[in-house]
Regions:
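Amphipathic alpha-helical substructures
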Residues: 3, 8-101
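Generic detector of intrinsically disordered, low-complexity, polar/charged segments
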Residues: 12-15, 120, 158
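Beta-strand-rich binding/interaction modules
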Residues: 76-77, 92, 96-152
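Terminal end segments
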Residues: 167-169
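Compositionally biased low-complexity segments at domain edges in trafficked proteins
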Residues: 172-173
């Protein structure tokens, strides 16, 4: 649904930028993430070529996206479209029944969002790719499944909304 400007531009908007970078760093890996960051700030990702005083550059978001895509040889525009151009966070919709765990991404713009997800099954942590916005895994009823146990992927978590509702109720008392 639609989000009001009051909801979109609350104090959480600043945290969203940090979480977006946190997710990008996890997705790219440290080496590639810092190469892209150095190139964005200094015009080179080659640290030894930097000499003091180091002059930072003024760049824009699209330049950073272009740097990330070029250095990774992949197109991550889908991620930036959802995280930076939409107020609503992507939601990972899950269901577990009949021996299957089904996961799918839902975004406010109904565009593909192939964000991989780390999932721990009985303590075995693996990263699962999303081919067609949907992932289905076979799991036993007794299996302990934890989705994104280290909170690497920025996404909407319904529990956050419940906490906000409870805070509002307490304020009214």
């Amino acid at each position: 649904g639609q989000i009001t400007s009051e909801q979109a531009f609350n104090s959480d908007i600043y945290g969203k930028g940090g979480w977006t970078l946190h997710t990008l760093r996890w997705l790219l890996g440290d080496e590639l993430f810092w190469q892209a960051t150095r190139e964005l700030l200094y015009g080179t990702n080659d640290s030894p070529s930097l000499t003091y005083p180091i002059q930072t550059r003024y760049r824009n978001t699209q330049e950073f996206i272009d740097i990330v895509n070029r250095l990774s040889s992949k197109d991550y525009t889908w991620m930036f479209d959802v995280y930076l151009k939409q107020a609503a966070l992507p939601e990972l919709v899950t269901s577990r029944q009949n021996g299957q765990l089904s996961l799918s991404w839902r975004t406010s713009i109904n565009k593909p969002f192939p964000m991989p997800v780390p999932i721990s099954i009985n303590g075995d942590l693996q990263v699962y790719p999303f081919e067609n916005d949907t992932l289905t895994l076979d799991v036993e009823a007794r299996d302990k499944v934890i989705i994104d146990p280290e909170m690497k992927v920025l996404r909407y978590l319904p529990i956050i909304g419940l906490c906000e509702e409870n805070l509002e109720k307490r304020k009214k008392r």
